[in-house]
Amino acid sequence: MRSNMIKKGIDRAPHRSLLRAAGVKEEDMDKPFIGVCNSYIDIIPGHMHLNKFAEVAKEAIIEAGGIPFEFNTIGVDDGIAMGHIGMRYSLPSREIICDAAETVINAHWFDGVFYIPNCDKITPGMLMAAVRTNVPAVFVSGGPMEAGRTKEGKSLSLVSVFEGVGAFSSGKMTREELLEIEQLACPTCGSCSGMFTANSMNSLMEMLGLALPGNGTLVATSTERHNLIKDAAKHLINLIEKDIRPRDIVTEETIDDAFALDMAMGGSTNTVLHTLAIANEAEIDYDLTRINEVAERVPYLCKISPASDYSMDDVHKAGGVAAIMKELIEMGAVKGDRITITGKSLYENVAHAQITNTDVIRTKETAYSPVGGLSILYGNLAPDGAVIKVGAVDPSIKTFTGEAIVFNSQEEAQEQINNGAVKEGQVVVIRYEGPKGGPGMPEMLAPTSAIQGRGLGTKVALITDGRFSGASRGISIGHISPEAAEGGPIAFVENGDMIKIDLIERTIEWEISEEELAKRREGWTEPEPKVKKGYLARYSKLVTSANTGGVMKI
């Protein structure tokens, strides 16, 4: 066992003395030491209940024959951090979470790790740590929030509140109506109830083979999640005994299949960023162009908020992620013979699943679209790629051409959108918000929600080198690479330039001559860093572009 490094031999007597002080008994020294990597945090609704999950996990690990040691990571609530300096810390927190987990796991030579994530950057941060350390691991997330309901029974989520702000500012909603939505949208603990980033990643974990069926859709308040925890603990001990590690499970083919599920469910654009980062930690050289290849063979089967009024709970009641996975395997879009944490194949894990509501989960024959819900766009404005959640764009929109209205920060854009400066037919360009330029690649939920709330969702496009919340919808193109801070083409766009977006051909083109572009390049100088000390200053110097997952390189 790995843990023998700290508990066996005469020279480890001091180590054992400290372990005894921590409650380890003599008879425990021959048992596997299990790290319980938790992320309990009071201020994050998706994590406020995870202390209870950890207690269930520790009891289950002891019962299964292991010795648990709980430790915690940091976390950022993206909704609370949205629209101000706090959002610049969101994506960078992913790297801290990964590094922190690696530090505790390797410093103490755990034999296995039981990860308990839930929200946006915590889940990918822990997944990155799992494949980086390559110690036997299982995941059980905190689960999605129950959907809110108006007094009339209409489904609500956090995006309802963000879009309500835009509706109020444009006179389409009263203060009292907005207050009602604010009070009803988020009724329980758990990750936000739609197919936003947290639930996208927690669903993808089922396809990755690192979490059990039900992980992505069982609501946080369900006692069935405790059964997932107990089962996962037993599987973890088995993984340790058989020496099955995360990199045995997560392969290049696994990454393809994760994107296949993403396409079928119209997941958050952030999944592209995070899954590429996970591949990087697993030492898989994954080409961004493969994502469009996956999209071509995977139909769009399941529209969830913000693309519809369905919540994750609705998906669970309709058969869950397992039913979608089974459909994808049986149509040949996903390989069903891959190994998973259960010791069984992917198909064996989901063979029991059935689609019970074809309004929520469609079949191949009745799919919303024959191609997946995410696209990578290329063109002279994004030579290294950009991402759009086509599943959250009005189906009638195939192309969009408009004049650029350019902003050098999200705050500037937000102010002008609220003031009515953005008009129908324009392409809002928000730049210097990439991984380096932000720094931290902040999400643009406030601007996209303001556009939707003002009734411009099908009449205005928004492009950025920043990123979007999973709750964003409309013609919202993010991750434009190279970013403006690196001298990417988006740095040279000016007001009035024509930009054409083609969702069928997956292109984003900017009307400019080579001569004019060269002239604009000559007058450009790299901007001063917005942050000159602290973690964000270090992050901006080390982080890579979005097309490689926004990972840090030494």
Swiss-Prot record:
Cofactors: [2Fe-2S] cluster; Mg(2+)
- For the keyword RNA-binding, the answer is no
Its Gene Ontology molecular function terms? Answer: 2 iron, 2 sulfur cluster binding; dihydroxy-acid dehydratase activity; magnesium ion binding
What does it catalyze?
(2R)-2,3-dihydroxy-3-methylbutanoate = 3-methyl-2-oxobutanoate + H2O; (2R,3R)-2,3-dihydroxy-3-methylpentanoate = (S)-3-methyl-2-oxopentanoate + H2O
- Cofactor annotation remark: Binds 1 [2Fe-2S] cluster per subunit. This cluster acts as a Lewis acid cofactor.
Q: Keyword RNA-binding on this protein? A: no
UniProt: [2Fe-2S] cluster binding residues: 119, 192
Q: Which InterPro entries match?
A: Dihydro-acid_dehy_C, DihydroxyA_deHydtase, DiOHA_6PGluconate_deHydtase_CS, ILV_EDD_C, ILV_EDD_N, IlvD/EDD_N
- Enzyme Commission (EC) number: 4.2.1.9
Task: Tell me the route in metabolism or biology where this protein functions.
Answer: Amino-acid biosynthesis; L-isoleucine biosynthesis; L-isoleucine from 2-oxobutanoate: step 3/4; Amino-acid biosynthesis; L-valine biosynthesis; L-valine from pyruvate: step 3/4
In terms of Gene3D superfamilies, this protein maps to: IlvD/EDD C-terminal domain-like (3.50.30.80)
Write the record's keywords in alphabetical order, separated by commas: 2Fe-2S, Amino-acid biosynthesis, Branched-chain amino acid biosynthesis, Iron, Iron-sulfur, Lyase, Magnesium, Metal-binding
The active site lies at: 469 (proton acceptor)
> Its family?
Belongs to the IlvD/Edd family.
HAMAP family assigned: IlvD (MF_00012)
What the protein does? Functions in the biosynthesis of branched-chain amino acids. Catalyzes the dehydration of (2R,3R)-2,3-dihydroxy-3-methylpentanoate (2,3-dihydroxy-3-methylvalerate) into 2-oxo-3-methylpentanoate (2-oxo-3-methylvalerate) and of (2R)-2,3-dihydroxy-3-methylbutanoate (2,3-dihydroxyisovalerate) into 2-oxo-3-methylbutanoate (2-oxoisovalerate), the penultimate precursor to L-isoleucine and L-valine, respectively.
Q: What is this protein called?
A: Dihydroxy-acid dehydratase
- Organism listed in the record: Shouchella clausii (strain KSM-K16) (Alkalihalobacillus clausii)
What's the source species' lineage?
Answer: Bacteria, Bacillati, Bacillota, Bacilli, Bacillales
Q: Which gene encodes it?
A: ilvD
